[in-house]
């Protein structure tokens, strides 16, 4: 016996698999066979269009420095979001060649601060390179440790931002630094339980602004 309750919901196959296209006279029409050559041309054409569209997008480089991997997760999430409108890529600071920095259009920095104002291990090279570009010194005796230097830059960043809130502060000026054409933003992860809160992120933000 086959009992069927009514009303009921019945499963049916997808209509695009079972529908039969009919011509003017009501007779079934034959499906158009697409050859491999035509399909390959269509794929090549669509790839070319996508390449042209991607070439017009602004390139965005996302740099991260981390000790625990949290900043890397944030950086990858940020990259996925920016890929909707930018030609974005993400990489660690120790893998980035600082020589390419002045040719970037948009740089996004995601970094934590390790310990008492120290940069993460994979961010030391990048931070030191920025510091040397901003404050070149041939005398090794005059060079302070990166910890002291980044903390001092971070403290200067706080005083600079507080002074920029004053009415007489002027924002209209023409930048002539080596990174004048680079747009940037820095996002820091840290805890206010430490005296130097997000010191490395603030230092990178300040150095990029001074160089641009």
From Swiss-Prot:
Family of this protein: Belongs to the NOS family.
Disulphide linkage map? none
Cofactor: bound how, per the entry note? Binds 1 FAD.
UniProt lists compositionally biased (Basic and acidic residues) regions at 158-173
Locate the Flavodoxin-like domain: which residues? Answer: 60-212
Cofactor(s), names only, from the UniProt record: heme b; FAD; FMN
Where are the stretches annotated Calmodulin-binding?
30-50
Question: Which residues bind heme b per the record?
Answer: 11
Q: Which keywords annotate this record?
A: Calmodulin-binding, FAD, Flavoprotein, FMN, Heme, Iron, Metal-binding, NADP, Oxidoreductase
Its recorded name reads: Nitric oxide synthase
Relate the protein's function as given in its record.
Answer: Produces nitric oxide (NO) which is a messenger molecule with diverse functions throughout the body.
As recorded in UniProt, its EC number(s) are 1.14.13.39
Q: Which InterPro entries match?
A: Flavdoxin-like, Flavodoxin/NO_synth, Flavoprotein-like_sf, NOS
Keyword Magnesium present in the record's keywords: the answer is no
Q: Where is this region: Disordered?
A: 155-175
Q: Which organism is it from?
A: Squalus acanthias
Residues that, per the record, bind FMN:
186-212
